[in-house]
């Protein structure tokens, strides 16, 4: 993300989107009621029927559509400014945002919080590939700011332990898996990988990848597959490789939340109302909230107020994208939970 211009007196910030992580950051930063100005194409009636005309429009945001790990965001809203001759004021329009696109966001209140969120996009965005492998299954994932992207998974399908061809088959399967991982990493311009699993199989795969020139970190996990990847994140295998990935922080915070709920010690709350009460009491240490709650037609406005208040009070706010592992864990608790500095009475 490149912040191109800031006009604090008008509440305006102009940015250029540089990659798909920026698309996600914009989705999480935009609020209903924001104004978004950009070049776009609009179908208008002409002498020979409807045709798409490029133009600059400003819309008042009503919502946005984003699919995790995609590179296109559709910002939906009502046109408030545009060429007079087309009579578009008051009509609905969606502006597509993608890498390379420049847009201007206008926010009357809370520009500082918006800028803070957007400037996260100017920081380096690490991507950490994790391979979890055992004798039954394997899974390659890429852990990014917006969540865990599951790249591929499968089973090694090795012969039984008493089969005389097991050793040769194991070597062949290891080479095939290492080659597939190598191709995927090169495709994504990644030069590092974390390999986890039980026993010696992970070490053999790691050795092959190291011979391919990758920087490899090896750690133990009780299983391969998705469970092994998630275990690696929980136990901190990615620390030192990616310190500030928001997706990792979300999963770690949710683990802590569940522990406090199980203990009943009063250091964890969930739901918009209880989290709001805690924020008003300056008790919130960490707020974890789903982005679809922020864009909800029913609770979105109150959810935005909660985020703004928590940030104002100095709490860490983690926004979780729809469809990710953290989002699945957040859903049963009303899409928002918080960790407290101290217990409060409700």
UniProtKB/Swiss-Prot annotation:
Enzyme Commission code: 3.1.-.-
Primary subcellular site in the record, as a coarse category: cytoplasm
Top-level EC class: hydrolase
Compartments where located: Cytoplasm
GO molecular function: endonuclease activity; metal ion binding
Cofactor(s), by name: a divalent metal cation
GO biological process: nonfunctional rRNA decay; nuclear-transcribed mRNA catabolic process, no-go decay; nuclear-transcribed mRNA catabolic process, non-stop decay; ribosome disassembly; RNA surveillance
Cellular compartments per GO CC: cytoplasm
Keywords: Cytoplasm, Endonuclease, Hydrolase, Metal-binding, Nuclease
Record remark: domains: The N-terminal domain has the RNA-binding Sm fold. It harbors the endoribonuclease activity.
Function, as annotated: May function in recognizing stalled ribosomes, interact with stem-loop structures in stalled mRNA molecules, and effect endonucleolytic cleavage of the mRNA. May play a role in the release non-functional ribosomes and degradation of damaged mRNAs. Has endoribonuclease activity.
Subunit structure: Monomer.
Family: Belongs to the eukaryotic release factor 1 family. Pelota subfamily.
Name of this chain's protein: Protein pelota homolog
Naturally occurring in which organism (per UniProt): Ignicoccus hospitalis (strain KIN4/I / DSM 18386 / JCM 14125)
Gene: pelA
């Amino acid at each position: 993300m490149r912040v191109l211009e800031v006009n604090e007196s008008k509440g305006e910030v102009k940015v250029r989107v540089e990659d798909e992580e920026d698309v996600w950051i914009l989705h999480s930063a935009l609020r209903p009621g924001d104004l978004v100005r950009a070049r776009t194409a609009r179908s208008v009636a002409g002498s020979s029927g409807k045709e798409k005309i490029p133009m600059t429009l400003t819309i008042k945001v009503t919502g946005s559509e984003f699919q995790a790990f995609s590179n296109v965001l559709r910002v939906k809203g009502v046109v408030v400014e545009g060429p007079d001759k087309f009579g578009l004021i008051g009509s609905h329009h969606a502006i597509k945002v993608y890498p390379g696109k420049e847009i201007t966001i206008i926010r009357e209140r809370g520009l500082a919080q918006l800028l803070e969120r957007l400037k996260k996009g100017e920081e380096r965005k690490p991507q950490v590939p994790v391979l979890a492998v055992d004798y039954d299954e394997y899974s390659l994932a890429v852990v990014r700011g917006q969540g865990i992207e599951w790249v591929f998974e499968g089973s090694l399908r090795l012969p039984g332990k008493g089969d005389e061809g097991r050793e040769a088959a194991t070597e062949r399967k290891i080479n095939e898996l290492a080659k597939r991982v190598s191709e995927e990493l090169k495709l994504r311009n990644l030069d590092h990988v974390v390999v986890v699993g039980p026993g010696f199989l992970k070490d053999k795969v790691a050795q092959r990848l190291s011979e391919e020139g990758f920087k490899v970190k090896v750690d133990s996990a009780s299983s391969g597959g998705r469970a092994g990847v998630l275990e690696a994140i929980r136990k901190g295998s990615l620390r030192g490789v990616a310190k500030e990935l928001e997706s990792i922080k979300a999963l770690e915070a949710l683990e802590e939340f569940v522990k406090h709920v199980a203990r009943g010690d009063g250091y964890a709350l969930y739901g918009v109302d209880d989290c709001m009460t805690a924020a008003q009491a300056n008790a919130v240490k960490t707020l974890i909230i789903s982005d679809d709650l922020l864009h909800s037609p029913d609770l979105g406005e109150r959810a935005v107020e909660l985020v703004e208040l928590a940030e104002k009070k100095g709490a860490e706010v983690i926004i979780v994208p729809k469809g990710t592992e953290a989002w699945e864990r957040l859903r049963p608790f009303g899409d928002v939970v918080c960790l407290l500095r101290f217990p409060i009475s409700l």
